A protein has these predicted regions:
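Membrane-embedded helix boundary and interhelical linker motif in transport proteins
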Residues: 32-87, 140, 245, 272
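Membrane-interfacial amphipathic/re-entrant helices at transmembrane-helix boundaries
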Residues: 1-24, 52, 59-65, 133, ...
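Helix-loop-helix "hairpin" substructures at the membrane interface of multi-pass membrane proteins
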Residues: 77, 143-224, 228
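Alpha-helical transmembrane segments within multi-pass membrane transporters and channels
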Residues: 61-101, 106, 155, 258-259, ...
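Loop-to-transmembrane alpha-helix initiation sites
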Residues: 17, 93-94, 123-127, 146-151, ...
Length: 315
């Protein structure tokens, strides 16, 4: 009974975290599924968003403005990765690693603003600052409950992205990911669309970082470590469970958010079962591996191919 009570009490927190990471998962979806680019910048840009947001709020900047600044900082990180890849000819995965590596020092510099040196952790209290979301109110039946706020946030975000990817520019971005050679033949500057896609993706990741730092009450230099794996887990879980049902683009983005919620509910359940937090990364890797393997096995072992008819007429 104590286990069930503890599990139920922890569910609101898991859902709230899932919604925040769902925004990050949408960013991963844009590069992984739409652009078909393996971008590892997100491990750094998530921390950049958190660092920028917390530093600005601590210096008296309104939360809304701080979140916009965090998003722009993430877009700048995506721009750097995009230029590494398109202008310098560096492979996308290596370009992301280089930017991620550089962002570690950049984030330390940002978090040390006004303190005379780099800081690995910056706390921020909802008692002193008007934050948009906070874990303190996750069980409150009020409008400041982070679940309610984040649901509205995700709905608006998905609506805006659905509109954007329906525009000519958005369709060009999707065409680039589908077939770069054909996109070029249609007069699309694929270098521009790749850079734009990376900017949008990392902007969303940094936005999630800003929200996460508010929710947990601090920004940490290592908060983005392993973010790409969590994002991939959310995207893949959503696709495996809802891939046959959700055909609309907006619903596919929704599936990524739901995948993140499911991921955190599962992680929460496993932790309540007694698993050490030291093993979370191992469990995450196993979850991603399993959900990546399922579609392959389904296609290989459970999909019947066309039956070939033999006989004299076909000899």
């Amino acid at each position: 009974m104590d286990f069930l009570t503890s599990l139920v009490n922890s569910m609101p927190g898991a859902v709230a975290q899932g919604l925040i990471w769902g925004i990050m998962a949408i960013g991963v979806y844009i590069t992984y599924r739409i652009l078909d680019v393996a971008d590892l910048t997100v491990d750094g840009s998530l921390g950049t968003g958190g660092a920028v947001c917390v530093v600005l709020v601590l210096n008296g900047v309104p939360v809304g403005v701080a979140l916009v600044a965090a998003t722009l900082a993430g877009m700048l990180a995506g721009l750097v990765t995009g230029l590494f890849h398109t202008a310098c000819g560096i492979p996308a995965i290596l370009a992301g690693i280089l930017t991620q590596l550089a962002l570690y020092s950049v984030n330390l510099r940002i978090m040390g603003t006004g303190t005379g040196g780099g800081k690995a952790n910056l706390p921020i209290s909802v008692d002193k600052y008007s934050l948009l979301v906070s874990a303190r109110y996750v069980r409150a039946l009020a409008l400041n409950n982070p679940i309610f706020v984040l649901l509205i946030f995700c709905a608006i975000l998905i609506g805006v992205l659905y509109w954007f990817f329906g525009t000519e520019l958005g369709c060009s971005l999707r065409a680039t990911g589908a077939n770069q050679h054909m996109a070029r033949a249609q007069g699309i500057n694929t270098n521009v669309t790749i850079v734009l896609g990376l900017m949008v993706s990392n902007g969303l990741v940094a936005l999630a970082g800003g929200l996460l730092s508010q929710y947990q009450g601090f920004s940490d230099i290592n908060m983005g470590r392993g973010a790409i794996v969590i994002g991939l887990a959310a995207v893949i879980i959503g696709e495996v469970i809802f891939g046959k049902i959700f055909r609309n683009f907006a619903l596919k983005l929704t599936a990524a958010v739901i995948g993140a919620i499911i991921y955190y509910i599962v992680m929460n359940f496993v932790l309540r079962m007694g698993l050490s937090t030291d093993d979370l990364k191992l469990l995450t890797a196993l979850v991603v591996a399993v959900f990546l393997t399922i579609p392959y096995w389904k296609g290989k072992y459970f999909t019947k191919g066309p039956v070939k008819k033999g006989g004299k007429d076909n000899a």
